[in-house]
């Protein structure tokens, strides 16, 4: 068994798929995974793959041409999951895709296709949740800017940003992914862009969560006022609003700090 390993970014995953396909070893004899690799398995050869933009672009063109735009979006969402087995899930989906074309998207009876849809749905659901759960703090540093921190399981910044770009087109805002040291920056009335933050920038921007904002007290007051003690149902609340979303929500801060 040959195990191809790569970084969890999209270009690396697509390059890894290109190398596995080009090896001609056969799908039964290869496995793909992202790094870092945990425990090494006996009788496996591990092959690290460096990202190559030309090879990644070649895979992208093949997907769009032979399977279609919907399949490319599915592949993109799976890659954004940042699961260690994401490259392998995409690779096995593409085995069917390059054989059956656009019909592959309707072959949910095949485990490889169903698994790809399942992972992409998890990523989409998390992105949609952040549409509702993101909270902005108003920061004044020469000019007003709205700043929000999130800690998503998947890399959903590029999926969340278009929603707020449409809702807040004339505002300066930032959404920071604390887990990946990435940020989406939206200048007022201009397109947003994705940037990687330096350690100094991360440290400075982390202070925004400790600033005082009167709207935070309004959120907390609203949250307390609408609660009915006799109908308190924490289990139901956790179902609709899982705990890992609450770290950056002001209405839950006093409960998390106590």
How would you label these PLM feature ranges?
Residues 1-53:
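N-terminal ordered "arm"
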Residues 2-9, 47, 111, 145-156, ...:
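Conserved aromatic-histidine-acidic binding/catalytic patches
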Residues 13-23, 92-96, 159-166, 217-224:
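Short, hydrophobic/amphipathic alpha-helical patches that form generic packing surfaces
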Residues 33-131, 135:
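Charged, alpha-helical interface segments at or near domain boundaries
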Residues 73-78, 178-179, 232-238:
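Short coil/turn segments at secondary-structure boundaries
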Residues 103-196:
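Internal, well-folded beta-alpha domain core
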Residues 172, 183-184, 188-190, 203-258:
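Long, compositionally biased intrinsically disordered terminal regions
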């Amino acid at each position: 068994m040959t195990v191809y390993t790569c970084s969890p970014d999209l270009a690396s995953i697509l390059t890894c798929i290109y190398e596995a396909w080009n090896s001609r070893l056969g799908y039964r004899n290869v496995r793909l995974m992202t790094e870092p690799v945990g425990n090494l398995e006996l009788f496996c050869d591990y092959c690290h793959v460096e990202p190559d933009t030309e090879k990644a672009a070649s895979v992208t063109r093949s997907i769009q041409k032979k399977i279609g735009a919907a399949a490319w979006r599915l592949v993109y969402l799976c890659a954004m999951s940042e699961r260690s087995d994401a490259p392998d899930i995409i690779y096995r989906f593409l085995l069917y895709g390059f054989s059956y074309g656009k019909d592959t998207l309707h072959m949910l009876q095949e485990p490889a296709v169903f698994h790809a849809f399942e992972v992409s749905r998890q990523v989409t659901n998390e992105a949609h949740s952040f549409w509702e759960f993101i909270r902005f703090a108003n920061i004044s540093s020469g000019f007003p800017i709205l700043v929000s921190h999130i800690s998503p399981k998947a890399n959903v910044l590029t999926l969340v940003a278009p929603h707020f770009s449409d809702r807040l087109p004339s505002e300066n805002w930032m959404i920071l992914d604390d887990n990946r040291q990435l940020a989406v920056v939206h200048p007022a009335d201009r397109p947003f862009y994705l940037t990687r933050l330096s350690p100094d920038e991360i440290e400075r921007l982390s202070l925004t969560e400790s600033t005082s904002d009167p709207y935070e007290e309004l959120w907390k007051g609203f949250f307390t006022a609408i609660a009915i003690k006799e109908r308190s149902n924490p289990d139901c609340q956790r179902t609709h609003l899982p705990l890992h979303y609450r770290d950056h929500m002001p209405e839950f801060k006093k409960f998390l700090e106590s």
